[in-house]
Every structure is written in structure tokens, then in C-alpha cells.
């Protein structure tokens, strides 16, 4: 497999790729087919490639998170492109690579939020959408999956509720208190309270929670 490794994933990555077959062998040691695999030093994306292949072979529901500091653009130009190629079956130049593997792929850039913000909890809430999407495996599209961060948003949503026939779930700040009428209106929709644990450590450090 090391002799064929340069062809895997449809991207070039000298002296760094790991054989997909080898990583799949490691993953097969886990009985569960519903695990989350973290590669905190991702390079060419072999781990993600292996997870996708194994899911296709045995019908598993494994997920993966690939992390890299994007040095020299490695994440954008190598890791992301490889996983995209495996999923779509098309190389970056448009040529055929494979039949593809149906899957979802999200790319996030991380950054630091200053602890000197006057109200850190309000600032962190601006970034809560990414956390919700990662945990629940959904896309907050404002139609099927909607966030409600304050009472004014709840009022507007209720006022225009007839315009949202496809709503499946609401993700609601714990500070929002629905009225009796709103509870009746939203009764057929899954409601998830946005939990403190997303940023509990950070808020405890600055004394906004305990």
C-alpha cells in the first residue's frame, strides 16, 4: 500500500501520507460503528478518507474531526481538497477520481475571543451556531433549523409562524421564555435549549457562571 499511497485521495503530499488501508485496520478494532475519530495533527486527510471508506463498506455512521494549523495552506489545499474529492468523486481539476461517497463536510476556522469583553457570554453566543451545527449534525438554515436567542426573536417567529412550514427544530437560548401561546404554536417542533456547557469553562474563568 505504501507503493500506491501517492495516488490516494487525488492530492499530492510527499513524505506524509498514511495508507488508508492501515488506518481502516486501526478503526476496525472498535466494535462500535458510531464513533467520532479525532485527528489533531491532520496532514493529507488520510484519517477522514479511511473513515469514509469504512462507512461505505460496512454501513457505519462514524464521524471524524480533522485539525491542523493550516501551515503553508495545507488544510485548504490538501486536507480539505482530498476529503472533497473522496466525497464528490471529482478531483480539483474536474477529472474523475471515483464514484464518490455521500457524506457531509464542514470546514471551520478557529480563533480566540478576548476575555476582556464586557459581557463575554453575549460575545460567545454570537459563535454558538457553529457549536450547535457540530453537535447536532445540522445546518442552521433559518427555515428548517432555527435559533431563537432572545424574546424579540421568539415574538417575530411566532408572528410569522405560518411562513415556516418546514421547521424541524428550534435551538433556544436558556434566557428565552416562551409565552403560553408560543408553546402551543411550537408544540409539534423539537425544541433544544442551548446548553451552558458549550462555553462553561470560559464563563467560569471570568466569573459569569459558577
What are these language model-derived features?
Residues 1-3, 13, 20-36, 56-210:
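Accessory, often C-terminal, charged low-complexity segments
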Residues 8:
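ATP-dependent phospho-/nucleotidyl transfer catalytic cores
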Residues 18-21, 43:
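Short, glycine/acidic-rich beta->alpha junctions
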Residues 35-54:
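A phosphate-binding catalytic loop at a beta-strand-loop-alpha-helix junction
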Amino acid at each position: 500500500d505504501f507503493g500506491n499511497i501517492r495516488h490516494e485521495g487525488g492530492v499530492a503530499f510527499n513524505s506524509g501520507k498514511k495508507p488508508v488501508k492501515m488506518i481502516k485496520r486501526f478503526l476496525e478494532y472498535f466494535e462500535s460503528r458510531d464513533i467520532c475519530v479525532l485527528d489533531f495533527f491532520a496532514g493529507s486527510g488520510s484519517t477522514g478518507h479511511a473513515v469514509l471508506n469504512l462507512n461505505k463498506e460496512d454501513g457505519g455512521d462514524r464521524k471524524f474531526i480533522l485539525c491542523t494549523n493550516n501551515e503553508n495552506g495545507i488544510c485548504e489545499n490538501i486536507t480539505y481538497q482530498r476529503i472533497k474529492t473522496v466525497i464528490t468523486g471529482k478531483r480539483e481539476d474536474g477529472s474523475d477520481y471515483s464514484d464518490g461517497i455521500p457524506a457531509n463536510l464542514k470546514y471551520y476556522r478557529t480563533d480566540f475571543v478576548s476575555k476582556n469583553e464586557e459581557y463575554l457570554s453575549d460575545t460567545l453566543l454570537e459563535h454558538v451556531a457553529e457549536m450547535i451545527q457540530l453537535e447536532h449534525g445540522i445546518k442552521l438554515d433559518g427555515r428548517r433549523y432555527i435559533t431563537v436567542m432572545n424574546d424579540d426573536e421568539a415574538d417575530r417567529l411566532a408572528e410569522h409562524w405560518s411562513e415556516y412550514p418546514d421547521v424541524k427544530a428550534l435551538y433556544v437560548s436558556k434566557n428565552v421564555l416562551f409565552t403560553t401561546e408560543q408553546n402551543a404554536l411550537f408544540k409539534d417542533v423539537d425544541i433544544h435549549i442551548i446548553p451552558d456547557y458549550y462555553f462553561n469553562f470560559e464563563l467560569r474563568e471570568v466569573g459569569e457562571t459558577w
